Regions:
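Hydrophobic, regular-secondary-structure patches
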Residues: 1-41, 62-64, 153, 168
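Alpha-helical membrane-protein architecture signal
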Residues: 5, 180-190, 200, 239-243, ...
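Mechanotransmission and gating elements of multispan inner-membrane complexes involved in transport
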Residues: 15, 97-198
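Hydrophobic secondary-structure segments that place a key small or acidic residue at a functional site
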Residues: 24-27, 36-48, 55-130
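Transmembrane alpha-helical interface segments in multi-pass membrane proteins
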Residues: 196, 205-272, 276, 294, ...
Length: 326
């Protein structure tokens, strides 16, 4: 775990390009209700600086925010739900037993869709220091608001100033400085890996589907050789025979696309509900109309391409040979 001092907060805040900085505490806490004990995270911050709410997008669901000097708590959204933290949820103005101390609940934050954050307890830094007065307490994070036009330079300057304050050499730091863009990029990289894995599975599925469609159309042509011969004997052109079988293969692809969209939406919706039930509601599927259309069109084209060769074979059938075919 990282450990930062008040002096290091001031070092960060005095760095050129930094508008404001604040230290944040994060500890484990024991809570108790009706004789049942649980261990959760408790986060302490300076309510005079709204950086916490800005970074973690915390919005009050009911009650109020913490104010300087408060010896009370604001709870995450999960404390409002039955059978999430305890069987019976908390309500506004209830008392929570925190580290053996009775503390009043003055508010609840709206859900951020992340189980750990929605299960956290929030207090002021001063109250945090009071709750843990018997143990050494250091800031776990320093959050800063900086000039976004020169964010890379500011990040490097913060690293340089903290290294100097800690007496550490470059490359041997026991901390790191990360911008919000860096965090998004790291999450995006992990998400891209998952997406490409899913795309690979989808491409394999498309390949298998194309082969199955081609086999189906070849079988259809073989079973209808006499029918093709009859149509040609009464004047059907090669192009018309080709169009008939190409339409059939395209229609097979269209039906497969529609069914795929229906089952895909159903499974995505079910997966979203399962993910939400375990506390990660921010990971939810979206269903843009263009994606549905694109999937169905792609499936139709795949069917058409897969059926092109069997359709051509059907159009080239000799009517005399076809009528003698057994």
């Amino acid at each position: 775990a990282f450990a930062f001092s008040e002096d290091e907060v001031r070092v960060v805040e005095s760095t050129s390009g930094v508008y404001s900085a604040t230290g944040v505490y994060l500890k484990n806490a024991e809570i108790e209700k009706s004789g049942v004990k649980k261990y959760v995270s408790i986060l302490g911050y300076d309510p005079k600086k709204p950086l916490m709410s800005d970074v973690f997008t915390l919005n009050v669901y009911t009650g109020r925010e913490l104010q300087p000097g408060d010896r009370r708590v604001v709870l995450g959204y999960n404390y409002l739900l039955p059978n999430k933290i305890f069987s019976k949820p908390y309500e506004l103005n209830d008392n929570i037993i925190l580290n053996g101390r009775k503390v009043k609940v003055i508010g609840f934050y709206a859900s951020v869709g992340n189980a750990p954050d929605d299960s956290q307890i929030y207090v002021t830094n001063d109250f945090m220091e009071e709750l843990y007065s018997n143990s050494s307490l250091s800031y776990n994070w320093i959050i800063a608001k900086v000039d976004t036009k020169n964010i890379d330079r500011v990040v490097k300057d913060i690293e340089k100033n903290l290294r100097k304050e800690r007496g550490q050499d470059q490359g041997k730091e026991d901390f790191f400085v990360q911008s919000f863009d860096d965090m998004i990029e790291s999450y995006s990289t992990a998400l891209d890996i998952v997406i490409w894995f899913i795309v690979l599975i989808a491409l394999i599925s498309v390949f298998v589907s194309a082969i199955n469609t081609a086999n189906t159309m070849i079988t259809s042509v073989l079973e209808r050789v006499k029918e093709i011969g009859v149509m040609k004997s009464i004047g059907a052109k090669d192009s018309e025979i080709f169009a008939i079988f190409l339409f059939e293969s395209s229609f097979l692809g269209f039906i497969a696309g529609v069914l795929g969209v229906i089952f895909g939406v159903a499974l995505s919706f079910l997966g979203g509900k399962i993910i939400e039930s375990v506390g990660y509601g921010f990971l939810q599927p979206t269903f843009p109309a263009w994606l549905f259309i694109a999937c169905i069109v792609f499936a139709t084209l795949t069917g058409a391409i897969s059926g092109a060769l069997p359709s051509r074979s059907a159009s080239k059938v000799n009517p005399v040979d076809a009528l003698r075919y057994e």
